[in-house]
Amino acid sequence: MAAAPPAAVSEPTAARQKLLALLGQVQTYVFQLELLRRCDPQIGLGKLAQLKLNALQVRVLRRHLRPGLEAQAAAFLTPLSVTLELLLEYAWREGERLLGHLETFATTGDVSAFFTETMGLARPCPYHQQIRLQTYGGDVRMELCFLHDVENFLKQLNYCHLITPPSGATAALERVREFMVAAVGSGLIVPPELSDPSHPCAVCFEELCVTANQGATIARRLADRICNHVTQQAQVRLDANELRRYLPHAAGLSDAARARALCVLDQALARTAAGGGARAGPPPADSSSVREEADALLEAHDVFQATTPGLYAISELRFWLASGDRARHSTMDAFADNLNALAQRELQQETAAVAVELALFGRRAEHFDRAFGGHLAALDMVDALIIGGQATSPDDQIEALIRACYDHHLTTPLLRRLVSPEQCDEEALRRVLARLGAGGATGGAEEEEPRAAAEEGGRRRGAGTPASEDGERGPEPGAQGPESWGDIATRAAADVRERRRLYADRLTKRSLASLGRCVREQRGELEKMLRVSVHGEVLPATFAAVANGFAARARFCALTAGAGTVIDNRAAPGVFDAHRFMRASLLRHQVDPALLPSITHRFFELVNGPLFDHSTHSFAQPPNTALYYSVENVGLLPHLKEELARFIMGAGGSGADWAVSEFQKFYCFDGVSGITPTQRAAWRYIRELIIATTLFASVYRCGELELRRPDCSRPTSEGLYRYPPGVYLTYNSDCPLVAIVESGPDGCIGPRSVVVYDRDVFSILYSVLQHLAPRLAGGGSDAPP
C-alpha cells in the first residue's frame, strides 16, 4: 500500500519558515560581528575577504527584502518581520563599519585605536533617542534610554491613539524603530546598560491579574516584580575543561601543532593546579588531632572491658560529631568558596589560553580584554561583577556573593553555633580528653564533669538530659531537708542562664530565618542583573501591534477614497438642513435604560487602543477587560478611571447634554490643549456618536447601525481587506466619520461601493437614512449597515 503523500504546506507557513531560516542566518552573522569587534584585529584581517563577501550578501539581501518589508509595514506587521528588519539594518551598518575599521588598522596597526572605534569608547552613549509625538492636544517630547522606556512609550501611545493622527504616530514610531535598531538589532544578547528588570511590563501585569493576590494590591505586587519578558535570563554554565576537550578537534591545524598545543596545555594546567594546591595549604590540624585521639581511645575499647563515664562521654560526643558530618552538605556548602577563588579560576583560564596561543601561533593575541586590561583591573567590584569573565559563569558569581553574605553574618558566635553545632561538640570533646589525660577519669565528683559535657553537647542538638551549663542539678522532688538560701540563689542563677540561653537560641533561629528569606528575595534581583539576558518577544510584538493600528487607519482612508461612489458631505451644500432635522428628531427621545450596558461596552471598545485586543481573541473577553489593561499599564489616576467608567452612565441619553459637537465640527479639538483635556473631549465625541446611532436605530426602526473601527479588518491570505457596511470612526480630525453604505459582493471596497465622508454625526446619519429609505419602503431584505 502506497504511503500517503505529505500534506501541502500553505503559502503563509512556507513564507514564515523561510523568514525564520533567514533570521537565524542574520543572527549568526551579527554574532560574528560582535565577536570580531572584541577579538584581535589581526584575526579579522586574516578573514577580510570572507567578511567582505558576507557584507555584500547582507547588502544584496537588504536591497532585495526592503521593498517587501516596507509593503508589509504598511499592511500588517508581525514580530518576526519587525525583528528581521531590525537585524538586517544593524548587520548592514555595523558590518560595513567594522570593515572600515579593519582597513584602517591594516594601515596604522594601532590596536588601541581599533578597539576604541569598534567598541564606541570615544563616542557618546548611542542609547539615547529623542521622541516627539504630535497629538491633537499638543506635542509630547521624551527620551528613550532603556528597553522599558520603549515599552512604556508604546503603551502610552496606545492609550492616546484616539487623539493622535497617523502622521504624528508614524513619525514617532520611526524614531522608536531607530532606537530598536541599535538596541534590539544587535543580536540576542542584551547590553547590561539597556535593561532594568525592576520595571514590570504589560505581560507582568497580566500575569498578576490572573494569579491569587492574597490580599495585596496590584501596585504592591508590581513593586516587587522582576520582569523576565522584555529580556529573558539565559543560564550559562562554563566547563573548566572546554579548551582541553575541543582543541583536538580544531580545524585548520596540523597534527603536530595540535599535539604540541595539547602538551603545553597539560603542562600549564598541571602548574596552575600545583600552585593552587600549595597556596591553599593543609587544613587546620587542631580539630582533626582531637578527633584522632578520641578515635584511638574508642578503638582500644571492646565489650570485655568496663566502660568508664569519661569513655562513654567521648563516645556520645563522637556520635554527635558524626551526625554533624552527615549534615554538613547543606545549601551554603554548595556555594563557591569566595570571589578570590573565582579570580584564581580566571587567571588559570587566561594562563592556559595564552600557552595554547603561543604554541599554535607563536604570539599572544591582543583581544579587547587584554589590550584594555589595565582599565578593567581598575574597575570596582560591582562593575567587575557586571562585566563577568571567561571562566566563571554568572551563577558562580551569584553563589559566591551569597556565600560571602552568609560568611559575613555568621561571624556572630550565636549564629555560628546554630549553623555549626558540631563546634560545641568539638569543644566539649576537647575538654573531656584534657581531663582524661590529666588522670581524672577514675570516679567521684570528677566523673560527673564528662557526663555534663556530653549532656551539654546533646542539649545543643535538641537532645540529652536538661541540665545547667555547669552540670548542677536542683533537688529532686522527693528530697528531704530544708533548702538553704545559697541553694536557692544557685538554682535561680542556673535558671537565669538557661532562660538566657533559650532566648538567645530562639532569637538566633529567627534571625537566621530572616537572613535566609532576605537572601532568597535578593537572589532574584542578582540573577536578573548578573545573568546573561537575551531579548524577548515583548518589544517586537508591542511595536507591531501599535504600528498596525495606525497603519490600518491610514490604509482605510486610502481604500475608501478609491470607492466607486464617494459622497463628501464636508463641503456639500444643503447639509446644514439635514443636520438640523436629524438633531431635532433625535433629541426628542431618550436611550432605553436596558441598552446602557451594551452601549457602555461599545464605548469601551472604541476608546481602547490597538495593543490590548482581548475582545478579539478566540476566548474573547469583554471590552472593559482590554480597556482595564490599557489604562492600568499607563498608570491612569483613579479619578480619571472612575470618570471613564461612568462616562456613558452619566449622560444616559437624556436631554441634550450628550450632543456636544457643533455643525461640521465633530472631533474638532480647536482651543483644547493638554493630553487629559483632549482625551476627555474625545470621550465626549465618542459618547455623542454612540448615543446618536442608538437613538437613530430605535427611532427609524432600521435595525442596529454598526459602529466600527478601521483596524477591525485584517488582511486575508490573498492580501484583501473586507470592510462590512457601517459607520467607521477613523479618529482623524479632518475626516472622522466614514459610512460604508454599500460594498462589493466579496466585502471589499471596489467599484460598487458607496462611501460617505463627513465631519458631523447628524448629517452622516441623514445620508445613511436616505440610502436606507428606498430599501425599507420596498421591503428589501438587505441588512442595514
Curated annotation (Swiss-Prot):
GO terms for biological process: viral DNA genome packaging. Keywords: ATP-binding, Host nucleus, Late protein, Metal-binding, Nucleotide-binding, Viral genome packaging, Viral release from host cell, Zinc, Zinc-finger. Residues 450-459 have a biased composition (Basic and acidic residues). Coiled coil: none annotated. The lineage of its organism: Viruses, Duplodnaviria, Heunggongvirae, Peploviricota, Herviviricetes. A zinc finger (C3H1-type) spans 201-229. Signal peptide: none annotated. Residues 439-487 are annotated as: Disordered. It holds the Pfam family PRTP. GO terms for molecular function: ATP binding; zinc ion binding. It comes from the Viruses. HAMAP family: HSV_TRM1. Belongs to the herpesviridae TRM1 protein family. InterPro entries: UL28/UL56. It comes from Human herpesvirus 2 (strain HG52). ATP binds at F696, A697, S698, V699, Y700, R701, C702, G703. Its main location: host cell. It is found in: Host nucleus. Component of the molecular motor that translocates viral genomic DNA in empty capsid during DNA packaging. Forms a tripartite terminase complex together with TRM2 and TRM3 in the host cytoplasm. Once the complex reaches the host nucleus, it interacts with the capsid portal vertex. This portal forms a ring in which genomic DNA is translocated into the capsid. TRM1 carries an endonuclease activity that plays an important role for the cleavage of concatemeric viral DNA into unit length genomes. GO terms for cellular component: host cell nucleus. This is Tripartite terminase subunit 1. Associates with TRM2 and TRM3 to form the tripartite terminase complex. Interacts with portal protein. Disulfide bonds: none annotated.
